[in-house]
Amino acid sequence: MLVSIEWLYNNLKDVKVVEIDYNPQISYYEGHIPGAVLINWRDFLSDNSRDFASPEKLSKVLGNAGINNDDLIVLYSDMNNRYAFYAYWILKAYGHSNLAILNGGIYKWLRENYPIDNDAVVVRRSEYKASKPDWSSRILVWELLSRLKEIVLIDSRSKEEYDGLTTAPPEHKCEQTQMSGHIPGAKNVPWTTLLNDDETMKSRDELGRIFSWLNREDRIVVYCRTGARASVVWYALKEVLGFRLVRLYDGSWVEYGNMVGVPVEKSISDHS
């Protein structure tokens, strides 16, 4: 669920607030919501392979953050709150269903002049037990390639990335891939079109209009560059609009754009 700034302020003592950061040095340590603990988004990843953490590692990460299995976790993040949605998708797969996202994130909190804290939170370690992940909401590239004609693909990157003008957004300009363009058949729905100017998610009615071209029985796959932006689209479709068959291709363009022999489409010519 999405919770408002006001709701969180009135319930700070009853929830576990977690800031999921891409770059903690310029976000969490410059000011965070009082009581919020920090988790670097990379802590959700495996130490030995390009995959997600084992249940044992995730248990340690959440336990070190003082989180218990029955806690209501309220997530927010830097980078326009996108990593809060990504963490929601991951934590739900590992069996933590008592989750919420702060609608509008830290930027709306700051704009509305709610208090912030600059000190790291002293955490009392807990004994968290993560479940074996249920990856029914995930699709790997091998299945994706075998089902291209059966699925509805949504590319949630910017139009420039989708068209093939660039392989990464400005904030990640050093992280390029070998190919530009998009997966054949994908429709471009930039993730930012789902947000209001204050970075809150648009209403259910507005989201319904954006995705009015979809059918309820469509098998939908969303992707972006690394999975974070696509998780916002996944959340809107699955958790807000109630589409049942929505999966996230978290390998996204950093995997697909570097693969040999896979089909790629561009909206522009390489010689234009």
Positions of PLM-derived features:
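N-terminal, Lys/Arg-enriched amphipathic/low-complexity engagement segments
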Residues: 39-41
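Extended hydrophobic/aromatic segments used for targeting, binding, or gating
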Residues: 244-272
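Helix-loop module immediately N-terminal to the HCX5R catalytic loop
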Residues: 43-73, 187-220
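Short cysteine clusters
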Residues: 224
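A mid-sequence, solvent-exposed acidic-amphipathic segment
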Residues: 153, 157-210
